[in-house]
């Protein structure tokens, strides 16, 4: 099978230089000397329904709202997965999890599937990642493949761009080199800690949690990373860089634990410091990741629910506030006119809905309906709001179409399916009134196996009670959404009139249920066929002796 990777590698340099660019999704092609910069912002763990521009009653997001008003907003964007690793893998490959199979913390992405950063780098882009989530940089899963520069703010020993180093040049270079060496030593150790079931059981002990949350920079540093990003982009602009730039940004502010600044607590939870029960609950809950991830045996109390949701809103507002300087830079006419900006999330958060607080096992919209805001170069499609359901995996197709890559240049004119056809899978097709997928979208909730093992060890009765070991999938068409558990229809919702998914219609709509079940069956068959010939995601296996040697070198063991 001729793949995107093989085609890009075979293209001569002169052909890459003459790649044509689609203008706003039109059929006409227009040659240009300048490819657009691309900025992909993933606001980790952000629910769409907590942004004001998505209809939320509280003013949580004035800066995002203002940016959305100048852009295109997709009202029903669905993440292909319910947690970080498979969701990002789908964004980076344009594939659903059943195809890319990067679904577990110990999976390494298949090299036959080209990543977005690789594709852009192959056609002349500089590629840089600013990431706050350790699962995308510290864990060795290859999701950072294709990036020339990777700046990690999560995990031990964060690294920052040289422009952020205020020390004298020589001192700064020496310090950066030492940091790189230490990172090369500690990264396999951190990776082992992240995926070892025994270590995970120890790590969730409440009195140990604050230690790794702080010293392993669990949430990274949103404020610092955004400051560095703006500085990096401004410096590059002032230097007159000739190559186009792809910038990936992951921010973790809305992920537990919740600890927003006091000014945002006063706005959204003014009672928090005065009501001891509320304060003590949240301080304790922040240090109980096992409770975040586990299905709830009983709902939180009214007080607990209120403080959890209010502090989440405060975190949303704080992150929005921090984004203002980046938006100011992106709103410069010279930047705005030739930059594709995409804002989305990998998943949402349960927040005491449907028996969950976190984002691990289920496929409800609390977890998989995410924001998707796109500002095209020249602000094409400005102000449009799109109600057609779309998958965020189509970010991949949209970005590659924007730089001129289309199916006739990727697979010799052979279109294997609409899932790989960049010309028809780009979001611009939906904007032009003819959605290539007919408004049909899927999501897949692969159970994180490390979490499943933890639940089995800590509270095995919950596994059966909540069917934790069974995979969930969902299909969307029109107003309806069908959720299957273990490949059997389980719940049917009219998500337009029942957005909270409280009224299960599966007994009332047998025809709709059967149609959506048929779509899901066909989808899984097609997704499995689309895997590369050698496909099984590589299960990362560290050399235990190598890890032990590095632990000894750091003085952790003898």
Predicted regions, residues:
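Catalytic domains that recognize anionic headgroups
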Residues: 2-558
């Amino acid at each position: 099978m001729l793949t995107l990777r093989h085609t890009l590698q075979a293209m001569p340099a002169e052909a890459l230089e003459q790649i044509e660019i689609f203008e706003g999704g039109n059929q006409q092609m227009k040659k240009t000397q300048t490819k657009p910069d691309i900025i992909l912002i993933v606001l980790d763990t952000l629910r769409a329904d907590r942004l004001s521009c998505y209809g939320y009653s509280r003013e949580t997001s004035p800066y995002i709202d203002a940016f959305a008003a100048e852009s295109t907003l997709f009202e029903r964007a669905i993440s292909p997965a319910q947690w970080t690793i498979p969701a990002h893998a789908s964004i980076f490959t344009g594939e659903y999890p059943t195809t890319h199979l990067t679904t577990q913390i110990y999976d390494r992405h298949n090299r036959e599937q080209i990543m977005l950063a690789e594709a852009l780098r192959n056609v002349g882009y500089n590629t840089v990642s600013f990431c706050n989530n350790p699962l995308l940089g510290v864990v060795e899963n290859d999701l950072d493949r294709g990036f020339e520069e990777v700046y990690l703010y999560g995990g031990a020993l964060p690294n920052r761009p040289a422009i952020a180093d205020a020390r004298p040049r020589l001192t700064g270079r020496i310090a950066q080199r030492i940091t790189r060496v230490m990172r090369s030593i500690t990264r396999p150790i951190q990776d082992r800690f992240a995926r070892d079931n025994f270590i995970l059981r120890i790590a969730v002990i409440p009195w140990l949690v604050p230690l790794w949350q702080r010293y392993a920079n669990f949430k990274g540093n949103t404020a610092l990373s955004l400051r560095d990003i703006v500085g990096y982009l401004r410096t590059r602009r002032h230097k007159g860089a000739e190559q186009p730039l792809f910038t990936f940004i992951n921010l973790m502010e809305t992920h537990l634990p919740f600890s927003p600044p006091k000014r945002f607590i006063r706005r959204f939870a003014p009672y928090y410091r005065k009501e001891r029960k509320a304060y003590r609950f949240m301080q304790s809950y922040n240090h109980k990741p096992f409770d975040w991830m586990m299905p709830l045996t009983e709902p939180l109390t009214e007080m607990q629910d209120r403080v959890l949701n209010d502090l989440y809103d405060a975190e949303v507002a704080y992150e929005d506030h921090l984004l203002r300087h980046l938006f100011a830079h992106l709103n410069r006419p010279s930047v705005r006119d030739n930059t594709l900006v995409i804002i989305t999330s990998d998943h949402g958060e349960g927040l005491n809905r449907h028996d969950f607080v976190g984002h691990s096992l289920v496929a409800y919209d609390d977890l998989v309906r995410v924001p998707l805001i796109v500002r095209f170069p020249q602000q094409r499609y400005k102000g449009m709001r799109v109600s057609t359901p779309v998958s965020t995996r189509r970010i991949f197709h949209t970005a590659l179409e924007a730089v001129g890559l289309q199916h006739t240049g990727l697979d010799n004119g052979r279109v294997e399916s609409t899932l790989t056809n960049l010309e028809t899978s780009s979001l611009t097709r939906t904007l032009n009134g003819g959605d290539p997928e007919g408004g049909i979208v899927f999501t897949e909730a692969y159970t994180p196996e490390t979490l499943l093992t933890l639940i089995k060890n800590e509270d095995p009765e919950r596994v059966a009670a909540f069917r934790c070991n069974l995979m969930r999938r969902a299909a969307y068409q029109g107003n309806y959404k069908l959720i299957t558990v273990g490949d059997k229809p389980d719940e049917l919702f009219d998500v337009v009139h029942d957005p909270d998914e409280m009224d299960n219609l599966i007994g009332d709509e047998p025809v709709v249920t059967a149609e959506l079940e048929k779509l899901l069956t066909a989808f899984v068959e097609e997704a499995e066929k689309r895997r590369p010939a050698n496909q099984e995601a590589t299960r990362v296996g560290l050399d235990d002796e190598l890890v032990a040697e590095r632990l000894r070198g750091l003085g952790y063991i003898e």
